[in-house]
């Protein structure tokens, strides 16, 4: 028998980042050498069991630590463990946060949720091994030792940054450092959203929203230039939303798709790509105009539209004289 393997190479890269500082600890006297976690790691467990951060719990005391990775990123967490006396897996709780307060928050409090990207969960880590987990937007991570009367040996805790490795072609600089910072933050935010598709946000909603995509497309065009993720995302919105359905459930978002097509061509001049969707652009506009005419006719009771009428001609001949 002949089998077809459906595989696709990830267009993004992975970068491992060690924490920059320890923000907070709980039961600090039960955590030895937390500073070892700030060392540059290699992602490999080994038999030396040296430079290990050890967290020890009791029946009533359960230590925890909050790490700062220095910048907002999209990705997950890599945990490399050592060799405690007990070989059984250790149960921990992991909390991601874009801020310290979010990483410290309980789910359900002050709007903190696990929607779209799970930011608060329990898991086990192995004896002398490596485990990778998480898929969210974050800067801070809190780790709690949940098991009682256990030791958690941490050789490394590193963030996994997942992003598209593309050059930044555009730049901005002025005498106002606050404006420079705002521009750089906007450029990085959009870069983080350029994942497998162009998302509206790296934590929530992680969806292709046409209304959000247009300002992102404008930013990408100015900062990064032509990149395939834009066309890939425009195509996805088109393919999953056949007419007469509206993209993302809103007619205005279908209109934003048409505007995005126009502006993408304006910046990059890719006529071959634009030609692929000429007909759909026309059909969306025809449908919108037909609805406009129907509303106007219903309100003013001036005309009726036959099935073979062209809405553009009706609008021009009847309401634009």
Annotate the PLM regions:
Residues 1-196, 211-212, 225-234, 272, ...:
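Extracellular/oxidizing-compartment recognition motifs
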Residues 136, 207-212, 225, 248-256, ...:
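Aromatic- and histidine-enriched alpha-helix N-cap/loop-to-helix transition segments
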Residues 163, 201-203, 301-304:
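Short linear capping/connector segments at secondary-structure termini
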């Amino acid at each position: 028998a002949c089998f077809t393997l459906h595989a696709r190479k990830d267009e993004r890269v992975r970068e491992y980042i060690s924490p920059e500082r320890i923000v907070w600890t709980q039961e600090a006297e039960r955590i030895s050498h937390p500073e070892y976690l700030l060392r540059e790691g290699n992602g490999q467990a080994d038999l030396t069991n040296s430079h290990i951060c050890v967290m020890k719990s009791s029946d009533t005391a359960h230590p925890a630590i909050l790490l700062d990775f220095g910048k907002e990123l999209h990705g997950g967490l890599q945990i490399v463990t050592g060799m405690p006396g007990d070989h059984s897996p250790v149960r921990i709780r992991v909390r991601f946060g874009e801020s310290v307060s979010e990483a410290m928050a309980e789910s359900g409090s002050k709007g903190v949720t696990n929607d779209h990207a799970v930011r608060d969960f329990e898991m086990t880590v192995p004896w002398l091994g490596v485990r990778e987990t998480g898929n969210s937007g974050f800067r801070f991570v809190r780790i709690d030792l949940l098991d009682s009367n256990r030791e958690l040996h941490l050789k490394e805790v590193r963030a996994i940054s997942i992003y598209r490795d593309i050059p930044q072609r555009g730049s901005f600089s002025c005498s106002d450092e606050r404006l420079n910072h705002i521009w750089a933050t906007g450029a990085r935010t959009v870069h983080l959203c350029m994942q497998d598709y162009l998302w509206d946000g790296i934590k929530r909603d992680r969806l292709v929203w046409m209304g959000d995509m247009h300002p992102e497309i404008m930013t990408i065009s100015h900062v990064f230039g032509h990149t395939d993720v834009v066309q890939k995302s425009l195509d996805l919105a088109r393919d999953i939303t056949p007419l007469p359905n509206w993209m993302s459930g809103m007619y205005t978002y279908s209109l934003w798709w048409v505007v995005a097509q126009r502006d993408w061509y304006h910046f990059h001049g890719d006529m071959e790509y634009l030609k692929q969707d000429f007909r759909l652009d026309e059909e969306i506009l025809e449908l919108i105009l037909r609805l406009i005419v129907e509303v106007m006719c219903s309100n003013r009771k001036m005309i009726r539209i036959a099935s073979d009428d062209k809405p553009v001609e009706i609008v021009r001949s009847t309401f634009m004289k």
